């Protein structure tokens, strides 16, 4: 480890940790102003990290992925997602697992999932009442969880379907504030002394989720001859070059990773999108006009190709990164990054926030302006909502598809407005960042249903 990392923050490590947990965006704003876009923080009890907000540094990292370990940099997430999650793997093991997991999230499978997303969106939105305010993020959490349960697990009814929804929601809500999130960062709070302690409650709920996942895996094995298109069935059928399937432990950890990563992030992004769309009349009108030109019952994949809808989704992901940084990368040997000579075992974290708010890349970065993504293309080191290199989010295509289709379906069929005329701040929620208060909206009217897909795609 270097005795002197680039531009170290000169305050006690315990104070850095408190501020990082409480407000990671404010933390980066403050210290980037003082030290520039490359600086080092030391979090008491966790370690030292070099924060990178320079596209050139990211390009150097993404093009030299083999010189870094990412799995061993994600140990903070292990208690949540299990030790055999793809996020905790490196080298050949990571390549094997990623290859096994890739097919369900790309290609023709997306077309089948698209129709189901539109259907689920209308089912959830039909519960909203005219004139009755609701929290957009909570509604999108419910919607996103339904998408994952139906598309990933292939469940649409039954006892297991009813059990997993409230259980998983309760599990995630245990870290719904900076204070409650602190147990993810402080080992001293990770004591399983039964359900009367927060960590004990979290682990108890996690074990219950694992039991439900195991039961679903075993039931699917009894129906291996059935042709099913859900993600879990495709994962179970996948084989590596040696003919080996994923173990039950790997399957459960990957399912929990998908639930954890896909549910939280997508719901939060859609809530932010509605906040900005409803706040900016010009954006809403332009988007509505684009959607209206499609006519009745458009093909979902046609919707996903709409340029302004795509730009709105991209701008939302730029302004509101769900994670404050990309996952840590640990140097395997001495390496030069952005002019800094770094020793082996130096931990680097690319700052999504610092990259996405650079004035030279995104003029007036505080302004919600989707047109910037129509006017120019950004390189993989200039726009990083889903990461980069060999560690780019595996499910990014499905996530982006869901974001677009939910926005389009809701705006085409329902009239919404913000319930409160006040700014919405960013708040830590576990490892992620979410709108404080969740974005309160109100339905002011309904339109004749434009997207009326009504058939389930999984048997």
From Swiss-Prot:
Gene Ontology molecular-function annotations:
heme binding; iron ion binding; monooxygenase activity; oxidoreductase activity, acting on paired donors, with incorporation or reduction of molecular oxygen
Query: What are the leading ranks of the lineage?
Result: Bacteria, Bacillati, Cyanobacteriota, Cyanophyceae, Nostocales
Q: What class of enzyme is it?
A: oxidoreductase
Q: Which InterPro entries match?
A: Cyt_P450, Cyt_P450_CS, Cyt_P450_E_grp-I, Cyt_P450_sf, Cytochrome_P450_monoxygenase
According to its UniProt record, the EC number is 1.14.-.-
Alphabetized, the UniProt keywords read: Heme, Iron, Metal-binding, Monooxygenase, Nitrogen fixation, Oxidoreductase
The UniProt record gives the binding positions of heme as: 393
Disulphide connectivity of cysteines: none
> SUPFAM superfamilies this protein is in?
Cytochrome P450
Q: Family, per the entry? A: Belongs to the cytochrome P450 family.
Superkingdom, natural source? Bacteria
Protein function: Probably involved in alkane/fatty acid hydroxylase.
Supply the PANTHER family for this chain.
Answer: CYTOCHROME P450, CYTOCHROME P450 12A4, MITOCHONDRIAL-RELATED
Q: Which cofactor does it need?
A: heme
What GO biological process terms are annotated to this protein in UniProt?
Answer: nitrogen fixation
- Protein name, per record: Probable cytochrome P450 110
């Amino acid at each position: 480890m270097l005795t002197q990392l680039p531009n170290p923050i000169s305050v006690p490590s315990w104070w850095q940790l408190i501020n990082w947990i409480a407000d990671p965006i404010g933390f980066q704003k403050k210290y980037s102003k003082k030290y520039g876009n490359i600086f080092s923080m030391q979090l008491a009890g966790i370690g030292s990290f070099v924060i990178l907000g320079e596209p050139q540094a990211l390009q150097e990292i993404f093009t030299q992925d083999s010189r870094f370990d990412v799995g061993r940099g994600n140990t903070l997430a292990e208690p949540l997602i299990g030790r055999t999650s793809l996020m905790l793997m490196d080298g050949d093991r990571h390549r094997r697992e990623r290859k096994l997991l890739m097919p369900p999230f790309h290609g023709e499978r997306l077309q089948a999932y698209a129709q189901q997303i539109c259907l689920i969106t209308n089912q959830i939105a039909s519960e909203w009442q005219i004139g009755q305010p609701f929290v957009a993020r909570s509604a999108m959490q419910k919607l996103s969880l339904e998408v994952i349960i139906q598309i990933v697990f292939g469940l649409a009814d039954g006892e297991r379907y009813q059990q997993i929804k409230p259980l998983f929601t309760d599990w995630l809500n245990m870290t719904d504030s900076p204070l409650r999130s602190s147990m993810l960062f402080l080992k001293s709070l990770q004591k399983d002394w039964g359900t009367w302690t927060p960590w004990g409650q979290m682990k108890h709920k996690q074990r219950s989720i694992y039991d439900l996942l195991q039961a679903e895996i075993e039931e699917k094995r009894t129906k291996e001859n059935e042709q099913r298109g859900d993600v879990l069935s495709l994962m179970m059928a996948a084989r590596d070059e040696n003919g080996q399937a994923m173990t039950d432990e790997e399957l459960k950890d990957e399912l929990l990773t998908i639930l954890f990563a896909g549910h939280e992030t997508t719901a939060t992004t859609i809530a932010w999108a509605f906040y900005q769309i409803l706040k900016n009349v010009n954006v809403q009108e332009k988007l509505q006009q684009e959607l209206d030109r499609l006519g009745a019952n458009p093909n979902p994949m046609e919707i996903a190709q709409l340029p302004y809808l795509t730009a709105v989704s991209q701008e939302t992901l730029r302004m509101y990164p769900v994670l404050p940084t990309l996952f840590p990368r640990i140097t395997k040997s001495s390496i030069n990054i952005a002019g800094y000579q770094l020793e082996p075992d130096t931990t680097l974290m690319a700052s999504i926030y610092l990259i996405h708010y650079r004035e030279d890349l995104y003029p007036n970065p505080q302004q919600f302006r989707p047109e910037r993504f129509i006017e120019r293309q950004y390189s993989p080191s200039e726009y990083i909502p889903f990461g980069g290199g060999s560690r780019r989010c595996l499910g990014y295509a499905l996530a982006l598809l869901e974001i677009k289709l939910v926005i389009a379906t809701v705006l085409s069929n329902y009239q919404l407005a913000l319930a409160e005329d006040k700014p919405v701040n960013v708040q830590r929620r576990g490892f992620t960042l979410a709108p404080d208060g969740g974005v309160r909206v109100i339905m002011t009217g309904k339109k004749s249903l434009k997207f009326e897909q009504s058939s389930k795609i999984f048997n």
